[in-house]
Amino acid sequence: ENMGSIIRIAAGFGATAVLTGQGSCDPFSRRALRVSMGNTFCLPVIESGTDLAATLRQLREQHSFELFATLLDESAEPLHQARPSGNCALLFGHEDSGLTSEWTSLCDRRITIPMHGDTDSLNVAVAAGIFLHHFANVR
């Protein structure tokens, strides 16, 4: 359900595409399609296959994208301070394990949603909604 939610949220906040990597849920599964409320067919969903790292390098080097790693890390830049300088891509990791160190190392910036109290994480779709809302409003 997270994949469908992320696609729906991305479409709602004006993303131009959703890129998936190896190990991602199938964005065209019946469940993801249902949760996306049809947005999977309105927003390009690009499956990068087995080499997401190469795709990310291509986005940065050939298309001047600024890559943002979204992390649970107090040392990362707080989301409210993040301002993209142009085209950007937000990377969301697996809900349990987060982004791999390889993908994080390819990113230009590391950003986080500051958490309070005993709450240490959010559902990946909820977090994606917060990040995408912020980026939609600072562009």
Segments from the language model and where they lie:
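Short glycine-rich loop/turn motifs that provide flexible caps or phosphate-binding loops at active sites
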Residues: 3-4, 20, 37, 92, ...
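Poly-acidic low-complexity segments
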Residues: 2, 50-51, 83, 120-123
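Active-site/ligand-binding-proximal alpha/beta "capping" segment
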Residues: 68-117
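RNA substrate-binding interface of SAM-dependent RNA methyltransferases
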Residues: 1-75
